[in-house]
């Protein structure tokens, strides 16, 4: 008899989300709390829960809120106008008007005063007094002009360091007149468009036409990514889009897929399989070698271009249409990551994060960090200022003891690589679309899984894994013929907590069945994942 599998799918009640750290001191406290939480969770029964579906917003126009519809329409109007008028990529340069005119504006009141003094000397005493009165009235105007201009200078100094502020304030009085003239010139700058940046009306981004009047349904999908990245602020989303287009042109991103970077970085990140919602999965393996590459200014640019290439390859796997899969799932394995004490590494990491965040908006459905060391919580505090709140809301963290369980919430076993506790192997010739079944074993009890072998000549192949093993496991072939001997395929073995999946096979010479026995000797319920295939002479 084949074991019936009855699995209750539970919705995840909560997930560990990286929240922004306000001050470094809180990091340690939060880390301890997280650690305690993990230990408490490990005392609960083990099981594979499907992820609480990360509800990505709909890209269908009808599903948007009224304010979102308006924002999308406004952005499309701005984009249409910019493309048609050929102003989308034009850079506005500032040019100052002649300084002479500005100087005249500042000194004009004094010239008038001198002129009136000369006229007053030739007039009567009574008229001279009146002229002096006029001078008294006119003179303050120069002070007024200076006061207004000086006030314009102050906000520009807020971005300087404390030392620079002190130095500038010391010299301010000595160069007051010069500052006034300079500031007046700046205030009257004019904007001139750079005519070199022309835009074709057939301009595309990730293969999607950007001109709204073309009517491509994918255009809304792309524009909504920029709007969501900027909280539906139209002007900010428009500027972000323009900067992305300029960045891609300057860095020749559209031709990056044809570049060769060698095999050195091949294991640092790679695409493999899909998650439960069909998002392509990208695995990022953090290691000492990778950190050295990022930390070296010489190698950093090569790494960045290689990483952009990988992102472009991932986007090619997406369906950028309303209702399609439009984002990737990112897995970050920190198992062999070194500590974080070198400044140059953080400069590199910051550069990677900022560039990807600024130029690939909303292309990541979730970031899952696995094999997280204790220092990760300090790293979170350092990186937090460079991440948007929306990005941080997609973070999930798993300590080493919870890696397999966490990943299986989001990725099915047949799509999860074997090194992470799944059944997926490179160039697997044994399995293709076979269903992965589940069965729960209660504490102190046993369950058997039966794989039928109806023909006398055939081969049976199976994969099996138990979350957090700590069970006794054995495999037997039981013939159908009465009185025939049972064949021990795998004698009883005590499986450790960190054992990986098992694949085995048996070639039978008579009809019967394979019986897999899981004896749960622990105090927690265990979930068993398995799949099998029967190869007969006719099928092979």
From Swiss-Prot:
Placement of covalent cross-link Glycyl lysine isopeptide (Lys-Gly) (interchain with G-Cter in ubiquitin)? 249
Output the PROSITE patterns linked to this UniProt entry. Answer: CRAL_TRIO (PS50191), GOLD (PS50866)
SUPFAM superfamilies (alphabetical): CRAL/TRIO domain (SSF52087), CRAL/TRIO N-terminal domain (SSF46938)
- SMART domains per record: CRAL_TRIO_N, SEC14
Cell compartments where the protein resides: Membrane; Cytoplasm
Give UniProt keywords alphabetically.
Cell cycle, Cell division, Coiled coil, Cytoplasm, Isopeptide bond, Lipid-binding, Membrane, Phosphoprotein, Transport, Ubl conjugation
Alphabetized PANTHER family for the sequence = PATELLIN-1, PATELLIN-4
Q: Mind telling me what this protein is named? A: Patellin-4
- Give the species this sequence originates from: Arabidopsis thaliana (Mouse-ear cress)
The UniProt gene name for this protein comes to PATL4
